[in-house]
Amino acid sequence: MNLSDPLGDMLTRIRNGQKARMSVITSPASKLRTNVLEVLKREGYIRGYNVEDVRPGVRNLRIELKYHEGEPVIKEIHRVSKPGRRIYSKIADLPRVYNGLGIAILSTPRGVMSDAEARAANVGGEVLCKVF
């Protein structure tokens, strides 16, 4: 499988899984994907995730989606910085998603974190995606 945007693929799997009301989805594992899922879990957008060994050298992420009263917790999730057009943001220019109701996930020199954590740490970085 040759993917030019692995993170975009995982976000699409999450979006499609929520639309289909699936409780669990899978995605190939990587450090970046795991770090993004950790932020989503910490912010309460997914129930959890774990890494499964499919065979030696191949690992998958098992992502448990979250619903509130039958409706998906994630209303919107989309990629901002793409392989063909990277989007970087200074601390002063960090985006506010729906006036603070959603989050932006950033890749910073201190690791992957939400926009609120980046403001608290006073760091900018690449805006990976927005979640609402």
UniProtKB/Swiss-Prot annotation:
One of its GO terms (molecular function) is rRNA binding. The keyword rRNA-binding applies. The keyword Acyltransferase does not apply. Keywords: Ribonucleoprotein, Ribosomal protein, RNA-binding, rRNA-binding. One of its GO terms (biological process) is translation. It comes from the Bacteria. InterPro entries: Ribosomal_uS8 (IPR000630), Ribosomal_uS8_CS (IPR047863), Ribosomal_uS8_sf (IPR035987). GO terms for cellular component: ribonucleoprotein complex; ribosome. One of the primary rRNA binding proteins, it binds directly to 16S rRNA central domain where it helps coordinate assembly of the platform of the 30S subunit. Part of the 30S ribosomal subunit. Contacts proteins S5 and S12. Belongs to the universal ribosomal protein uS8 family. This is Small ribosomal subunit protein uS8. It comes from Rhodospirillum centenum (strain ATCC 51521 / SW). The gene is rpsH.
